Every structure is written in C-alpha cells, then in structure tokens.
C-alpha cells in the first residue's frame, strides 16, 4: 500500500470485511449441516416424541445489538473546537453537496452507543487530512481522538483503532512516500493508548523516476 491515498486503505478494510463474511457463512453452513444430517445432532438425544416438545419450546431471546445512529459527520467536524482550522477550511463539497468524508461506526470505547470514526479527505486525490473519533456523551458527541498529520486514515479493526500515516521526504512524488507507519490504539482509562506501531521503509528504486543512490563505502 503505497501512495494511493485512502483508496488502498478502503480496499484493505473491504477485504477484511469480505473474509469475515465468508468465514461466517462457512460456520453457518457447518452448523446447518450438523443439525440436518440424519442420525446425528442434538435432536436424536431426546426420547421418542421429543420433536413435538422442541417445536413448542420458546424461542431463545437474542440480545439486541447497538444500532448505529446516522450522524451528520460534516456538521460534527465543523462544530468541533478540537478540529484544526486548516481542516475546516478544506472541508468543502467536491460535487454538489457531496463532501470528502468517510464515516465508520463501531465499538471502540465500550459505550452504550457505537463510536464514530470520521476521516476528512481532499477532493482531488482522496488524501486523508484529518481523522477523528467521537464518543456519545448524553445527547452529544465528544472528540476523544484526533490525528491531523496528512496523509492519515483511521479504521476500526476488531475493536481497536488503527491509524495509518504515510511519510514523505523532500521531492517524494505523491504516489511514492518514503515510509509508512501503522499505529494501533486501544481504549483504556477514558483515553486511547498506543498498543503497537509498525514502520515500513519503502525503496526509492521502485517506481520512481530517479535511480537509487548507492550508499558510500
């Protein structure tokens, strides 16, 4: 994933979601197969006539999941005093009333409602210029995380906050950053704490217009 703005990050998130969905369907298929095969499964363990008893049994109650509320992310960012002035100035519609904002809902802080991750990008090349996490507090939302060093993009991954930042040296083209950091945060004691950090150095000899300069002897 190099110099592709948020497109590669979105693709990575979509791939993870697809893998999780396929795995879930596989487990469901195995469960149905186990119950439907003659001579096997829990239905054969009871006495004769137990099928009619099972049919009349009460259906187990499933705990309702937290349904995400639809939030006006643009207004949330513009009204937030913690958001930098440069990000607010850049947050303008690209086409008609379509803003360059990605919004994700999920459980990051263990609250009663889903948390909201907002990524603000540029219109032309979809480079992330600001990432924020909002936690519901009563009837409003509190900014509990922000990162405003572009290019930056935040995602929810298995209950943790994952922030990707690409870094450029002088004269680096936009499509070829010199390095990238992926930082994982977890929620503890009412704040996000860094759990791990992965740093990747990219080769200047690949994809660039100039050849790599050999190191001096």
UniProtKB/Swiss-Prot annotation:
Residues 39-66, 192-217 are annotated as: Disordered. GO terms for cellular component: plasma membrane. A lipid is attached at residue 35 (N-palmitoyl cysteine). It is a lipid-anchor. This is Lipoprotein CseA. It comes from Streptomyces avermitilis (strain ATCC 31267 / DSM 46492 / JCM 5070 / NBRC 14893 / NCIMB 12804 / NRRL 8165 / MA-4680). Transmembrane segments: none annotated. May be involved in the stabilization of the cell envelope or may interact with the sensor protein CseC to modulate its activity, in response to cell envelope stress. A lipid is attached at residue 35 (S-diacylglycerol cysteine). It comes from the Bacteria. Residues 1-34 form the signal peptide. It is found in: Cell membrane. Keywords: Cell membrane, Lipoprotein, Membrane, Palmitate, Signal. The keyword Cell membrane applies. PROSITE patterns: PROKAR_LIPOPROTEIN. The gene is cseA.
């Amino acid at each position: 994933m190099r110099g592709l703005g948020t497109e590669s990050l979105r693709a990575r998130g979509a791939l993870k979601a697809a893998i999780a969905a396929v795995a879930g369907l596989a487990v469901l298929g195995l469960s149905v197969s186990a119950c439907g095969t003659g001579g096997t499964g829990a239905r054969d363990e009871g006495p004769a006539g137990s099928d009619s008893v099972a049919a009349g049994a009460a259906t187990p109650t499933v705990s309702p999941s937290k349904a995400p509320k639809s939030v006006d992310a643009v207004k949330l960012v513009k009204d937030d005093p913690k958001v930098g002035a440069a990000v607010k100035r850049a947050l303008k519609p690209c086409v008609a009333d379509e803003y360059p904002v990605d919004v994700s809902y999920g459980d990051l802080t263990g609250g009663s409602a889903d948390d909201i991750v907002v990524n603000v990008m540029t219109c032309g090349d979809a480079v992330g210029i600001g990432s924020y996490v909002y936690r519901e507090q009563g009837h409003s939302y509190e900014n509990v995380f922000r990162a405003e060093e572009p290019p930056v993009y935040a995602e929810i991954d298995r209950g943790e906050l994952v922030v990707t930042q690409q870094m450029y040296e002088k004269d680096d083209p936009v499509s070829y950053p010199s390095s990238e950091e992926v930082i994982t945060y977890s929620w503890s004691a009412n704040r996000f704490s860094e759990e791990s950090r992965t740093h990747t150095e990219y080769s200047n000899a690949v994809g660039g217009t100039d050849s790599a300069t050999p190191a001096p002897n």
